[in-house]
Regions:
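A short acidic, Gly/Pro-enriched loop at the edge of an enzyme's catalytic core
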Residues: 103-116
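Class I SAM-dependent methyltransferase SAM/SAH-binding core
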Residues: 50-105
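C-terminal alpha-helical "lid/dimerization" subdomain adjacent to the S-adenosyl-L-methionine
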Residues: 150-199
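Class I S-adenosylmethionine-dependent transferase superfamily signal
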Residues: 138-140, 192
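Conserved class I S-adenosyl-L-methionine
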Residues: 1-47
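A short, conserved alpha-helix within the catalytic core of class I
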Residues: 125-138
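Short catalytic micro-motifs in class I SAM-dependent methyltransferases
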Residues: 119-124
C-alpha cells in the first residue's frame, strides 16, 4: 500500500486554487454540499477548543473558527502543513505534525483532543476498506474518552452523484487523487460503529 499518490497532487500551485475549485465549484456543483451553507456550519457545530485537524489542506475550516484554543494540524504533506499554518496564522496553531494516518499515532498525541476532524481525507486515501478502517482506528487514538470525530468524504456510489460529480470522480480516481470507488455510506457507518458508541452518517 502506497499512501503517497493522493498527497502528491497537493503542491503550492494546486493549493492556491484549492479554495476556489474544491470549496466553491466542486462542493456546490459536483458534490452538491455547499461549503458555506453545509460544511462550515457542520464543522463549527462539532468543533471543540482542543482540536486536531487531520488533512490540513489550506486550513480553510479552522481559519474560519476563532474558538480553538489548542489547534494541531496533522498531514503527511509538508506543503499542506506549511500553507495551512500560513493561512491560519502561526499564533493560532499549537503544533504541526507530519504523520501517515495509516500508522499508529505518536504517543504524545494520544487522548489529547476533544475533537478530531477528517475533512476530505478518506476518499483520498490509497488503500482498501480495511486500510481505511485502520486509518480511522489510528485517528481515534487522539481522542479523549468523550471526544468526537467528525468530517466529510465523497462516496464512491455513482447513484449519489449528478453527471458532473460522476465525471469528476472518474477523473480524480484515474489520476490517483481519489481512491473511493468502493467507499459507501453503509461501509463507513459500519466501520465507525466498531469504534464509537454513537454514529451518524
Amino acid at each position: 500500500m502506497d499512501s503517497q499518490p493522493g498527497i502528491k497532487a497537493y503542491n503550492s500551485v494546486s493549493l492556491s486554487l484549492y479554495n476556489w475549485w474544491v470549496l466553491s465549484v466542486a462542493n456546490r456543483f459536483a458534490w452538491r454540499c455547499s461549503t458555506s451553507e453545509v460544511q462550515l456550519p457542520f464543522y463549527r457545530q462539532h468543533l471543540s477548543s482542543r482540536h486536531l485537524e487531520i488533512g490540513a489542506g489550506t486550513g480553510y475550516y479552522p481559519r474560519h473558527c476563532m474558538n480553538i484554543s489548542q489547534l494541531t494540524l496533522l498531514d503527511l504533506n509538508t506543503e499542506c502543513l506549511f500553507q495551512a499554518l500560513r493561512r491560519i496564522g502561526p499564533a493560532r496553531v499549537k503544533a504541526t505534525v507530519r504523520h501517515d494516518i495509516f500508522l499508529p499515532f505518536p504517543e504524545h498525541l494520544h487522548q489529547r483532543y476533544n475533537s478530531v476532524a477528517l475533512y476530505y481525507v478518506l476518499h483520498c486515501l490509497n488503500g482498501s476498506a480495511e486500510d481505511k478502517f485502520t486509518a480511522l482506528k489510528n485517528a481515534t487514538q487522539a481522542l479523549t474518552a468523550d471526544g468526537i470525530m467528525f468530517g466529510a468524504t465523497i462516496s464512491g456510489e455513482p447513484q449519489r452523484h449528478n453527471l458532473f460529480g460522476r465525471i469528476l470522480m472518474k477523473v480524480m480516481n484515474h489520476k490517483g487523487i481519489f481512491t473511493n470507488y468502493h467507499d459507501s455510506a453503509a461501509l463507513l457507518e459500519s466501520q465507525l460503529g466498531q469504534l464509537f458508541r454513537e454514529v451518524t452518517v
